[in-house]
Amino acid sequence: MAKQSMKARDVKRVKLAEKFYAQRVELKRIISDVNSSDEERWDAVLKLQTLPRDSSPSRQRNRCSQTGRPHGVLRKFGLSRIKVREAAMRGEIPGLKKASW
């Protein structure tokens, strides 16, 4: 199990990313627009740098929804490989069965 503080930190990052999403997209649009003046683009870069670091979506970590495990998480289920296997063996995931050939 992951520490509660690590789970809480990830939740905080998700909320911050949602809060600053529109602002971040607008600034990135200005930066990548070739029709913007160099001064406008530079101002946008500086404003983007002043945003909180944790508001960037790339700082979020995929974690298991049950255990908080950061590695081996299957996006389709939102669970770690261990919990997916346990649930599949109990028949709790419809349509998923153990491979046999």
Curated annotation (Swiss-Prot):
One example GO MF annotation: rRNA binding
> Superkingdom of the source?
Bacteria
Q: Name one GO cellular component term.
A: cytoplasm
Cysteine pairings via disulfide bonds:
none
Q: Which UniProt keywords apply?
A: Ribonucleoprotein, Ribosomal protein, RNA-binding, rRNA-binding
Q: Which GO terms describe its biological process?
A: translation
- Chain positions covered by the region annotation Disordered: 51-70
Compositional bias, Polar residues, is annotated for: 52-68
- InterPro entries from the UniProt entry: Ribosomal_uS14 (IPR001209), Ribosomal_uS14_bac/plastid (IPR023036), Ribosomal_uS14_CS (IPR018271)
HAMAP family the record matches: Ribosomal_uS14_1
NCBIfam families assigned:
PRK08881.1
Its assembly, as annotated, is:
Part of the 30S ribosomal subunit. Contacts proteins S3 and S10.
What this protein is reported to do is described as: Binds 16S rRNA, required for the assembly of 30S particles and may also be responsible for determining the conformation of the 16S rRNA at the A site.
- Tell me its family: Belongs to the universal ribosomal protein uS14 family.
Report what the protein is called: Small ribosomal subunit protein uS14
Q: Which organism is it from?
A: Mannheimia succiniciproducens (strain KCTC 0769BP / MBEL55E)
